């Protein structure tokens, strides 16, 4: 299955998602925002999430596949003051996604569309059997 990839996600967030509860995550890294910009929420919309950095993402890396429940991209204006006379105004883009755990996954192939393009992956859902 081919889907967008979110990289550099905290292992604690991935652990919480594996517990089965939907979570809302705020993304501020540009490459992750670009990766989810074209993702439409729905039961057939999946994203691969991993704690591996984008530069190190290769076939064989492990992560999780999640279902996208909601997305929003917004711009925040920030003003910083220094010494009472100087101030700097900046804008910061961020994205919020609500996701729910689907399955553990392994990367089969990585598709990179340049520095400012989205990163997507071909993933295989992992099967786990327990002897009883």
Give residue ranges: language-model regions.
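Short coil-to-beta transition motif at edge beta-strands of beta-rich domains
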Residues: 35-57
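Short, solvent-exposed loop/turn segments at secondary-structure junctions
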Residues: 11, 53-55, 73-74
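Conserved hydrophobic positions within beta-strands
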Residues: 67-72
């Amino acid at each position: 299955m081919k889907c967008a990839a979110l990289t550099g996600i905290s292992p604690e967030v991935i652990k919480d998602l594996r517990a089965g509860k939907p979570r809302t995550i705020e993304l501020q890294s540009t490459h992750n925002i670009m990766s989810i910009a074209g993702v439409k929420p729905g039961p057939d919309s999946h994203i691969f999430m991993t704690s591996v950095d984008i530069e190190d993402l290769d076939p064989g890396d492990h992560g999780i596949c999640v279902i996208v429940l909601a997305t929003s991209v917004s711009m925040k204006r920030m003003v910083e003051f220094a010494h009472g006379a100087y101030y700097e105004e900046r804008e910061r883009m961020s994205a919020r996604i609500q996701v729910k755990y689907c399955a553990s996954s392994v990367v089969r192939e990585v598709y990179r569309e340049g520095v400012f393009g989205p990163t997507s992956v071909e993933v295989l859902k992992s099967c786990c059997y327990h002897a009883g």
